[in-house]
UniProtKB/Swiss-Prot annotation:
GO terms for molecular function: GDP binding; GTP binding; GTPase activity. GO terms for cellular component: actin cytoskeleton; early endosome; endosome membrane; Golgi apparatus; late endosome; phagocytic vesicle; phagocytic vesicle membrane; plasma membrane. It holds the Pfam family Ras. It comes from Mus musculus. This is Ras-related protein Rab-22A. Signal peptide: none annotated. It is found in: Endosome membrane; Cell membrane; Early endosome; Late endosome. The gene is Rab22a. PROSITE patterns: RAB. InterPro entries: P-loop_NTPase, Small_GTP-bd, Small_GTPase. Belongs to the small GTPase superfamily. Rab family.
């Protein structure tokens, strides 16, 4: 079975639950007292998707303003980006649009974008309507899902949908399946003055 490494970065404001989503996906656990990410953290998880193994190389970025300049370093070369907002905080959804704009300007052109409305278990204090977020995601051709890292809602489904959207290696083989050979340049005879 073929193994594909897929770099995925999580972007979004501080406190939206990026680290909790990663922990739920990788470790199937939830820590309500998780510390804010400083810079970025890295975790991996391998899952089977159809006839391939997908090894997700997950970069969980810090959401604080002082770390925003580092974000391009993490999404450069990514197969996918998950932009997370908190359904109970309207401002995190507004800021999400800035993350999308930055990603479109500086990220890989073929990056798969997913929007995750986290904390969907807190519907009684919801500020972002699911329909509004879904409409926005559709307008930018992004995956949309509401998640709850706390209650393990739609976390695995999010990564399955990312696997589904990433073009298969069979569908688009590099160079039409043809490679090229490197050849050594013939060396010229050395000249000497004596």
């Amino acid at each position: 079975m073929a193994l594909r490494e897929l770099k995925v970065c999580l972007l979004g404001d501080t406190g939206v639950g990026k680290s909790s989503i990663v922990w739920r996906f990788v470790e199937d656990s939830f820590d309500p007292n998780i510390n804010p990410t400083i810079g970025a953290s890295f975790m991996t998880k391998t899952v089977q998707y159809q006839n391939e193994l997908h090894k997700f190389l997950i970069w969980d970025t810090a959401g604080q303003e002082r770390f925003r300049a580092l974000a391009p370093m993490y999404y450069r070369g990514s197969a996918a980006a998950i932009i997370v907002y908190d359904i109970t905080k309207e401002e995190t959804f507004s800021t999400l649009k800035n993350w999308v704009r930055e990603l479109r300007q500086h990220g890989p052109p073929s990056i798969v974008v997913a929007i995750a409305g986290n904390k969907c278990d807190l519907t009684d204090v919801r500020e972002v309507m699911e329909r509004d977020a879904k409409d926005y995601a559709d307008s930018i051709h992004a995956i949309f899902v509401e998640t709850s890292a706390k209650n393990a809602i739609n976390i695995n489904e999010l990564f399955i949908e990312i696997s589904r959207r990433i073009p298969s290696t069979d569908a688009n083989p590099a160079s039409g399946g043809k490679g090229f050979k490197l050849r050594r340049q013939p060396s010229e005879p050395k000249r000497s003055c004596c």
